[in-house]
């Protein structure tokens, strides 16, 4: 089992990434949401220059913020700084789009973006289209020492909804899941990933599946309010994404369907002007717990979507996730969480 740490991209992420590397973490993941955090590629470049072994990935980029040749160039450049340590994590762009008041990218756009980037990063000449104009493109100076196309850059596709999960299984080298800690939610996502993988002649076991989530060690008598402050921001984000990712709620696991769908409007104020309502809804996203989310973030949903509990409970849950097919768990946090996770999980399970 590999272990990762999740950062809300900032220019000093390299300090925590280097600390995590020293503590035995294998991966570091950086949020890409231009209206919320710092620029992901600048933060990753700093981390690449300050670390030696930890792998660095986007969590996650998308097809809309940048055209595919720019995305590919970013990763080819990072691959010069950290050869063989770079991973492209990509999805449809939930917050990076919704913080603009825009919808997430379409699956066809995601597929095309991945295909163009994969081709360019392998040194191929690939078709590229804007509107009705279709041209062939390639990196023109691959051996100039400006970019690195020699070390492979794996592409992991993020998903929560059935169709996106199946596409991830079909076209991804790996799949990124959010908050799929409990058996029913993890089993639901893996079944769709398997379906997509089989469509491409692959097995689920061929894919690198990782779960990004929150982590909190509980203390005796700890209140629900304390847990909500600790992991509530990520619980709300993860569950909201699941609720928005289905066209028919019946597609979700029956035992937690209603709990998940309750998060559908977590970041929506129906009475606010449509032109500006998104400006307030995502302030403090994934970092601050908002009072209006208190009724939604129950003990049950905390257990279903995060690694919250005693050290023994968390280790047992990770073992179960590994048995089901997960190859990495990545947790959000700074130095205190990194230290606790390294002490109570990595040293015991690694």
Which residues does each predicted region cover?
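Active-site mouth loops of central-metabolism enzymes
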Residues: 1-11, 61-69, 149-160, 215-216, ...
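An alpha-helical appendage that flanks or caps ligand/catalytic pockets
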Residues: 103, 107-145, 186, 191-320
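Acidic-and-aromatic substrate-binding clefts and catalytic sites of carbohydrate-active enzymes
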Residues: 7-12, 32-39, 63-69, 182-186, ...
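N-terminal beta1-alpha1-beta2 module of alpha/beta enzyme domains
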Residues: 1-59, 153
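Hydrophobic faces of well-ordered beta-strands that scaffold small-molecule active sites
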Residues: 3-5, 28-30, 56-59, 86-90, ...
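Conserved, mostly hydrophobic/aromatic
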Residues: 24, 47, 78, 117, ...
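Alpha-helix-loop-beta-strand connector modules within alpha/beta enzyme cores
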Residues: 41-61, 113, 120, 343-350
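Short, acidic/polar
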Residues: 9-20, 74, 159-167, 310-320
């Amino acid at each position: 089992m590999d272990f990762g740490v999740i950062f809300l991209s900032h220019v000093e992420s390299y300090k925590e990434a280097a600390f995590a590397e020293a503590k035995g973490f294998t991966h570091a993941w950086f949020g890409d949401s231009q209206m919320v955090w710092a620029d992901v590629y600048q933060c990753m470049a700093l981390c690449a220059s300050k670390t030696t072994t930890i792998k660095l990935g986007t969590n996650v980029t998308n097809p809309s913020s940048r055209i595919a040749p720019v995305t590919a160039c970013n990763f080819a450049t990072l691959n010069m700084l950290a050869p063989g340590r770079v991973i492209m994590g990509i999805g449809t762009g939930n917050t990076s789009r919704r913080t603009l008041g825009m919808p997430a990218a379409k699956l066809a756009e995601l597929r095309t973006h991945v295909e163009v980037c994969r081709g360019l990063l392998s040194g191929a000449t690939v078709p590229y289209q804007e509107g009705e104009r279709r041209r062939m493109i390639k990196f023109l100076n691959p051996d100039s020492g400006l970019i690195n196309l020699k070390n492979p850059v794996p592409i992991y596709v993020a998903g929560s909804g059935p169709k996106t999960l199946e596409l991830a299984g079909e076209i991804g080298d790996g799949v990124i899941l959010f908050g799929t800690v409990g058996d029913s939610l993890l089993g639901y996502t893996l079944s769709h990933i398997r379906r997509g993988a089989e469509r491409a002649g692959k097995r689920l076991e061929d894919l690198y599946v990782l779960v990004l989530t929150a982590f909190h060690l509980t203390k005796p008598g700890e209140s629900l309010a304390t847990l909500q402050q600790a992991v509530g921001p990520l619980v709300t984000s993860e569950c909201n994404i699941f609720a928005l990712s289905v066209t028919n709620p019946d597609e979700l696991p029956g035992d937690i369907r209603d709990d998940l769908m309750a998060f559908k409007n977590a970041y929506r104020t129906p009475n606010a002007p449509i032109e500006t309502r998104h400006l307030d809804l995502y302030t403090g996203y994934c970092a601050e717990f908002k009072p209006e989310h208190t009724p939604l973030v129950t003990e049950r949903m905390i257990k279903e979507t995060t690694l919250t509990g005693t050290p023994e409970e968390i280790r047992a849950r990770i073992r179960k996730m590994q048995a089901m097919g997960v190859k990495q768990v990545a947790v959000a946090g700074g130095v205190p969480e990194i230290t606790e996770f390294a002490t109570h999980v990595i040293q015991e399970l690694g």
